[in-house]
A protein has these predicted regions:
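Short, surface-exposed acidic
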Residues: 32-56, 77-87, 91, 158, ...
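Asp-based, Mg2+/Mn2+-dependent phosphohydrolase catalytic module
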Residues: 1-6, 112-115, 131-258
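Hydrophobic residues in well-ordered beta-strands that form the structural core
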Residues: 15-17, 126, 221
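An amphipathic alpha-helix signature
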Residues: 21, 25, 29, 33, ...
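A metal-dependent, Asp-based hydrolase signature
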Residues: 53-98, 108, 116
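Active-site neighborhood of HAD-like aspartate-dependent phosphohydrolases
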Residues: 1-52
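Short, acidic loop-to-helix structural element flanking the phosphoryl-transfer center
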Residues: 2-3, 8, 97-126, 134
Length: 258
């Protein structure tokens, strides 16, 4: 297997525990309990039905409009075409409020892994379909994290945010096709100057794993929602529950293993 030269990271669920799931769930609840209450009985929605499993399998990793449509279709909401934009906008307004309020955390194992991949000589990119990804990445001071955790890195500069640290940022761009199409990851690899076969993608969603494999890349699945089986079924080369479990010495040989 060729040595990895590039690492491409999804953001929500990989790097940060974001409020996206909360925003999708709660914005739909608000609609169902107010403006859409007249059609509620025609749907399969209930306050407890929008589970983490539903989010991971049907919504996670998709662009905003596609995610909104997937959720409405899942709950059999009628007249989706005229409702999807309202739902997507309501979700966006809520997620921005939550981000500005600091209602998210960065995963320490992910930040350690990001630093380790760059220290190993790889070029790195963030590649999320979310247009909010940059809001998270700008708020995370990677130099502060490293200092607090005793990490010394030759690639880390004072004052660097996580967004600054990435060599390439393709998050939030408008692509013609969303995941599981590989367009976003192929674009990231191209801008990194790395052939797809020399790149690995770190993903928490089945659609993202499928996109990586469709693009000819290695896929590292991170299971944070008890969905390891879904990631494996999607074709992940390795699935872990913590990125600390990945064998970093093996990475330098182009191997994904524990």
């Amino acid at each position: 297997m060729p040595k990895f030269q590039g690492a491409i990271f999804d953001v929500d669920g990989v790097l940060v525990d974001s409020p996206h799931q909360k925003a999708w769930r709660e914005s739909l609840r608000e609609l169902m309990e107010a403006g859409w209450r007249d059609i509620r009985d025609q749907t399969t929605w209930s306050p407890d039905a929008f589970t983490p499993h539903v989010y991971q399998q049907y919504v996670s990793g998709k662009p905003r409009m596609a995610g909104a449509l997937a959720a409405l279709d899942y709950f059999h909401v009628p007249d989706t075409e005229k409702r999807v934009a309202e739902y997507a906008q309501r979700k966006q307004e809520m997620v921005v409020r939550l981000i500005e309020a600091g209602d998210f955390t960065a995963y320490p194992d992910a930040l350690r892994f990001v630093i380790a991949t760059k220290d190993a000589g790889m070029r790195i990119a963030d590649a999320s379909s979310s247009k909010n990804a940059g809001l998270f990445l700008r708020k995370i001071r990677l130099d502060t994290f490293a200092a607090e955790h005793g990490i010394s890195s030759p690639t880390l500069k004072p004052g660097q945010t996580l967004l600054d640290y990435f060599d390439v940022d393709v998050s939030g761009r408008d692509f013609a096709r969303g995941k599981p199409d590989p367009e976003i990851f192929l674009t990231a690899a191209h801008e990194l100057g790395v052939e797809p076969g020399h790149a690995m993608v770190i993903e928490d969603a089945s659609s993202g794993v499928q996109a990586a494999k469709a693009g000819g890349m290695a896929a590292l699945g991170i299971s944070r929602a008890d969905d390891a089986d879904l990631l494996a079924e999607a074709g992940a080369d390795l699935v872990v529950t913590s990125l600390d479990d990945v064998n970093r010495d093996a990475l330098t040989r182009g191997e994904l293993t524990r």
